[in-house]
């Protein structure tokens, strides 16, 4: 199915694949969004690659790949990862390399990668 936009969203310099759902208030800049990704309200993505899902999953309204109010910059989100609400993935500390696989992410050359299948809880800050 085609991507569905609900409400008012801003997209600039981005590619959004088929089967996505983008909710009201989302801001997607210089990013690539893979298939079947559900983005909640008021999410900000900048310079982010979301691999997406291999297949469309039946979800309730509460189930989203990127939770409400989350801000992500310069990040790769591998397939089937789930990111909670009000998460901030900004690497404001400027960490260059760290392996936090047990927490579902690694940082390599300053780029945060959320590992495939990982779940990042609500309010988490990287």
Model-inferred region functions:
Residues 1-126:
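Left-handed beta-helix
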């Amino acid at each position: 199915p085609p991507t569905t936009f609900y409400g008012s969203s801003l997209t600039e310099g981005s590619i959004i694949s088929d089967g996505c759902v983008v909710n009201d208030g989302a801001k997607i800049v210089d990013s690539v969004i893979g298939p079947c990704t559900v983005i909640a309200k008021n999410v900000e993505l900048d310079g982010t690659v979301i691999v997406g899902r291999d297949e469309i999953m039946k979800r309730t309204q509460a189930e989203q790949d990127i939770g409400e109010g989350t801000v992500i910059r310069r990040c790769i989100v591998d397939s089937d990862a789930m990111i909670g609400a009000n998460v901030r993935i900004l690497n404001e500390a400027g960490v260059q390399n760290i392996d936090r696989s047990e927490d579902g992410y690694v940082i390599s050359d300053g780029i945060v990668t959320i590992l495939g299948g990982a779940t990042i809880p609500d309010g988490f800050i990287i």
